[in-house]
C-alpha cells in the first residue's frame, strides 16, 4: 500500500507523522458532490448504486491528500433492510414509515434478509478496487443504541426523548431490539471487511443523550459484543458523540481506537484510556468556517494537546458541515502534515 499511516497507527506501530481523515469527508461542502447529487436527488438512490457511492467516496481523495477513504453510505441501511421504510425528507432528515412503538413491533422484527445489503458490499468492493492501494478503506455502521433510537423515534431528533422513555420503561423489550441489532451490525461489518474494508468504525452518534448508567446498560455491552466479534479480522474505531465523560468505561470496549469530540482534552483522554488505545479527533468543525491562519493555530493546539506519540489520528470532533470551505480543509490537512512530524521523533 502506498500510504498505510492510518493502519500503522491502529496497529500500534511508529509513524513519521500524524494521519488525517475527515468524518463525512464526501459531502455537501464539495461542489463536485453537489453537482452529482443534483443529478440524483434521492440520497438512498446514491447509496444503493455502487458506482455512484464509489465516485463520491473518491471525490475528497482527488482533492485532498487524506490518509484514508471511507465508504459512502448511511448508518440507517440496516433498519431500512429490516423493513421500516426509510426515506430522507429535505430539511428534516431521515424518517421511518414504520417506527417501532411497541414491544410487539419489536418482537415481530426480523434480521435483514439475505442479500438485502449486498449493494453496500458492492460499493465497498468497487471503492477498494478504485483506490488501487492508495490509502486504506474504512467501513462503518451505526451502534445498536443509535439505530434503535432512530427506529423507535421514527426519525431524527434533538434529544430522542421517545426512544429514551421507551428504553427506561421497557428495558426488556429494548434488550431484545439491541441484541437483534448487535447480530445484524456484526454481520454487516464482517461483510464489509470481507468485501475489502481494512478498518471499520462504529458511530454511536446518540450515545451521548443517555444518562451514564443508561449508557452502561443500553450501549456499552452491545458495543463490546460487536467489537469482540470483529476486531480479530480488522481494527475497530468507536465514536460516541458527547461521550467524553465516559472514556473510562469506553476503554473496556476493546476497540483499537476511540473517537472524541471537541469538548474533550486529548491529553486528559490519553491519561484515562492509556497508551494502548488510539485516540481520534477532535477539531471543532466550526474552525473550517474561519481562515487558514486560525485553522493552523487550532491544529497546532490540537496536536500539542495529544503531544508526543504514535497512537493518534487527526480528525474533526464530528462530521464536517456543509458550510465548510474546501480551501480551509486543505489548510487544515497541510497544517497537520507540516506540524505533526515533530511529535513523532
UniProtKB/Swiss-Prot annotation:
Q: In this record, what's one Pfam family? A: URO-D
Q: Report the domain of life of the source organism.
A: Bacteria
Its transmembrane ranges are none
Q: What EC number(s) has UniProt assigned to this enzyme?
A: 4.1.1.37
Q: In which pathway does it act?
A: Porphyrin-containing compound metabolism; protoporphyrin-IX biosynthesis; coproporphyrinogen-III from 5-aminolevulinate: step 4/4
Q: Name one GO cellular component term.
A: cytosol
UniProt GO BP: protoporphyrinogen IX biosynthetic process from glutamate
Q: Where is the site described as Transition state stabilizer found in this chain?
A: 74
> InterPro entries from the entry?
UROD/MetE-like_sf (IPR038071), Uroporphyrinogen_deCO2ase_HemE (IPR006361), Uroporphyrinogen_deCOase (IPR000257)
Show the catalytic activity. Answer: uroporphyrinogen III + 4 H(+) = coproporphyrinogen III + 4 CO2
Localization per record: Cytoplasm
Q: Which residues participate in substrate binding? A: 24-28, 74, 150, 205, 318
Keywords of this protein's UniProt record, alphabetized? Cytoplasm, Decarboxylase, Lyase, Porphyrin biosynthesis
Extract one GO molecular function annotation from the record: uroporphyrinogen decarboxylase activity
Q: Which Gene3D superfamilies match?
A: 3.20.20.210
Principal subcellular localization: cytoplasm
Per the record, the similarity remark reads: Belongs to the uroporphyrinogen decarboxylase family.
UniProt cross-references to NCBIfam families, sorted A to Z:
hemE
Q: Its quaternary structure? A: Homodimer.
Cross-referenced PANTHER family: METHYLTETRAHYDROFOLATE:HOMOCYSTEINE METHYLTRANSFERASE RELATED, UROPORPHYRINOGEN DECARBOXYLASE
Q: What does this protein do?
A: Catalyzes the decarboxylation of four acetate groups of uroporphyrinogen-III to yield coproporphyrinogen-III.
Name of this chain's protein:
Uroporphyrinogen decarboxylase
Source organism of this protein record = Dichelobacter nodosus (strain VCS1703A)
Amino acid at each position: 500500500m502506498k500510504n498505510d499511516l492510518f493502519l500503522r497507527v491502529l496497529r500500534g506501530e511508529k509513524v513519521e507523522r500524524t494521519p488525517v481523515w475527515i468524518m463525512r469527508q464526501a459531502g455537501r461542502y464539495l461542489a463536485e458532490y453537489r453537482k452529482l447529487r443534483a443529478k440524483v436527488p434521492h440520497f438512498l438512490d446514491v447509496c444503493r448504486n455502487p458506482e455512484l457511492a464509489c465516485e463520491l467516496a473518491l471525490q475528497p481523495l482527488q482533492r485532498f491528500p487524506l490518509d484514508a477513504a471511507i465508504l459512502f453510505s448511511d448508518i440507517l441501511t440496516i433498519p431500512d433492510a429490516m423493513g421500516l421504510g426509510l426515506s430522507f425528507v429535505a430539511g428534516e432528515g431521515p424518517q421511518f414509515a414504520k417506527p417501532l412503538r411497541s414491544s410487539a413491533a419489536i418482537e415481530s422484527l426480523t434480521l435483514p434478509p439475505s442479500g438485502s445489503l449486498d449493494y453496500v458490499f458492492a460499493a465497498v468492493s468497487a471503492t477498494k478496487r478504485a483506490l488501487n492501494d492508495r490509502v486504506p478503506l474504512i467501513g462503518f455502521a451505526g451502534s445498536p443504541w443509535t439505530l434503535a433510537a432512530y427506529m423507535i423515534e421514527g426519525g431524527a431528533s434533538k434529544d430522542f426523548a421517545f426512544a429514551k422513555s421507551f428504553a427506561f420503561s421497557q428495558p426488556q423489550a429494548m434488550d431484545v431490539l439491541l441484541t437483534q441489532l448487535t447480530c445484524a451490525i456484526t454481520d454487516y461489518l464482517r461483510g464489509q471487511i470481507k468485501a475489502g474494508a481494512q478498518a471499520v468504525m462504529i458511530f454511536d452518534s446518540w450515545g451521548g443523550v443517555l444518562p451514564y448508567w443508561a449508557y452502561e446498560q443500553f450501549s456499552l455491552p452491545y458495543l463490546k459484543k460487536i467489537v469482540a466479534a470483529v476486531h480479530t479480522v480488522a481494527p475497530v474505531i468507536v465514536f460516541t458523540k458527547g461521550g467524553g465523560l465516559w472514556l473510562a468505561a469506553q476503554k473496556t470496549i476493546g476497540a483499537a481506537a476511540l473517537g472524541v469530540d471537541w469538548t474533550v482534552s486529548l491529553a486528559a483522554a490519553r491519561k484515562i484510556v492509556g497508551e494502548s488505545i488510539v485516540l481520534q479527533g477532535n477539531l471543532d468543525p466550526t474552525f473550517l468556517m474561519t481562515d487558514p491562519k486560525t485553522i493552523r493555530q487550532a491544529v497546532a493546539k490540537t496536536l500539542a494537546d495529544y503531544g508526543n506519540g504514535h497512537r493518534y489520528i487527526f480528525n474533526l470532533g464530528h462530521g464536517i458541515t456543509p458550510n465548510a470551505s474546501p480551501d480551509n480543509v486543505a489548510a487544515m490537512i497541510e497544517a497537520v502534515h507540516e506540524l505533526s512530524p515533530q511529535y513523532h521523533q
